């Protein structure tokens, strides 16, 4: 089981604003922000649900290659809301909401590229309600 994931971004404030909007439909919000004065490192923002930060961004510089992160959605409507919110926040389409039957018959997901080109996915693994 993964406890949390973190990765550097090229523009901390831009990425923080993007994820605050894009992850809200999935029940995520900014849980904690750690500033440089506290650690001696670049600032970091921890997003999560139910008060537990499990999705971290930080630093300045970004990565040489994009990451793929999939976040579980509560239902298909949440996948669609994530996609709309992420696009409105400046994300780029990398796969509109829909069934991805090549994974399994009920794999309903949407993919958005964040401002640094990371492939962020919201996925629901259940049948249509």
Regions found by a protein language model. Give the residues of each.
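A short acidic/small-residue loop/turn micro-motif
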Residues: 101-102, 125-129
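Vicinal oxygen chelate
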Residues: 11-14, 70-115
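A short linear hydrophobic-aromatic micro-motif
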Residues: 29-31, 55-57, 93-97
